[in-house]
């Protein structure tokens, strides 16, 4: 699911390819504009970051570009999840209302299954993914919750320069370092076993060049690695689901989100006592202002300022509690103002859906379950 809900590596590769192809750097803003009001500095030319020349028009490999979805049409296909809530002041009933329709790619069998779990604290019902003992979007006697993708920029690609005298080493801020490697045997039914060697740098695992078209933007004598929050060996995201099912108040629900790592989500909450809230959950990488591609293209992995400096604290994530309007909604849209001090993403969802949702929500003084279905 985390791989389905992130596309920032695709965007980095696409921006780098455009930078190589365009004679006019300003053309990038026409073809891949930043979100209105983003205030992002102009990018350096991708080729200027490296001493070795890259082809201006590199041909993409013929093998499937996506390792898990070989028939995918290509990058840039946004999801369309929606979540919205209303307080009792804006509802015909005496309680708060919450609706959610999380969207993922079409698959067979289906990803989502409706289930009811009986806990010591009471029953919980909602959407589950087989194999995960939690309700990811649903309700208990005390609380309802839903999710939309936050589009958090949780991936960075890094160009790792190989030691020309020893290809088992790569360049770091402190000199050459050995790749961390292991060998795995893949058993093939009806065929011969396949042995692969995996390699890691300090930034993350090394990716095969045919994946995500990264070979087209990898300089000669280099490989590409990936830093991604979902690869954390301390991923406690499942704890958020377990805590939500036992939560009894808005405060309990917000606190549960602190355990979440990836994929980043906007958690929408509505409580039995009529309160509503929304919090972005998921670890947000801490990047330096001196990052030479601003996380919009692959960066040089041996430059210390390009590397992640850890993760921001949970309380810094965008949060909205009991708005005066009595209405909350999210359609993967931008959730922070331009002066928000941290980098969340360069690629928010579209504005059409949130505009329509806002219009529909404000068209009524009070809402019902039926109006939410509309």
Model-identified regions with their sequence ranges:
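Short active-site loop/helix that positions an aromatic residue
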Residues: 104-117, 159, 238, 247, ...
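Short helix/loop capping segments that flank catalytic or ligand/cofactor-binding pockets
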Residues: 13-15, 94-95, 106-110, 115, ...
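Compact, glycine/acidic-enriched structural inserts
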Residues: 121-201, 242-246, 302, 358
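Short beta-strand scaffold segments in enzyme catalytic cores
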Residues: 83-87, 133-137, 265-270, 275-277
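Conserved, charged catalytic cores of large soluble enzymes
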Residues: 50, 214-239, 244
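Ordered core of a single globular domain
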Residues: 20, 34-38, 56, 233-234, ...
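Hydrophobic alpha-helical segments
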Residues: 207-210, 216, 222, 262-364
């Amino acid at each position: 699911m985390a791989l389905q809900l992130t596309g920032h590596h695709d965007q980095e590769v696409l921006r780098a390819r455009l930078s190589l192809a365009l004679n006019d750097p300003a053309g990038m803003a026409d073809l891949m504009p930043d979100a209105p009001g983003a205030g992002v500095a102009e990018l350096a030319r991708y080729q200027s970051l490296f001493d070795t020349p890259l082809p201006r028009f590199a041909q993409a490999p013929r093998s499937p570009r996506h390792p898990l979805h070989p028939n995918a049409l290509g990058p840039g296909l946004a999801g369309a999840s929606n979540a919205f809530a209303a307080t009792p002041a804006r509802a015909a009933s005496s309680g708060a209302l919450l609706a959610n329709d999380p969207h993922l790619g079409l698959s067979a069998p289906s990803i989502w299954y409706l289930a009811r779990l009986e806990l010591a604290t009471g029953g919980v019902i909602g959407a589950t993914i087989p194999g995960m003992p939690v309700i990811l979007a649903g309700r208990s006697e005390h609380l309802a919750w839903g999710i939309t993708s936050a589009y958090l920029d949780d991936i960075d690609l890094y160009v790792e320069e190989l030691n020309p005298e020893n290809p088992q080493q790569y360049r770091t801020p402190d000199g050459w370092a050995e790749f961390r490697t292991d060998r795995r045997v893949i058993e093939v039914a009806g065929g011969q076993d396949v042995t692969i060697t995996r390699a890691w740098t300090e930034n993350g695992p090394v990716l095969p060049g045919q994946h995500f078209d990264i070979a087209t933007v990898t300089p000669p004598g280099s490989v590409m690695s990936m830093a991604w929050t979902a690869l954390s060996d301390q991923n406690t995201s499942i704890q958020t689901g377990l805590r939500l099912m036992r939560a009894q108040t808005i405060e309990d629900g917000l606190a549960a989100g602190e355990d979440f790592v990836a994929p980043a989500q906007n958690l929408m909450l509505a409580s039995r006592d009529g309160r509503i809230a929304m919090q972005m959950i998921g670890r947000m990488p801490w990047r330096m202002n001196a990052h030479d591609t601003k996380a919009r293209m692959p960066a040089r992995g041996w430059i210390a300022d390009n590397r992640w400096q850890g993760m921001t604290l949970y309380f810094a994530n965008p949060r909205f509690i009991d708005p005066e309007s009595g209405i909350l909604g999210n359609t993967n849209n931008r959730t922070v103002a331009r002066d928000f001090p941290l980098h969340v993403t360069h690629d928010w969802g579209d504005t059409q859906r949130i505009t329509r949702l806002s219009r529909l929500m404000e068209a009524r003084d009070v809402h019902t379950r039926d109006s939410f279905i509309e």
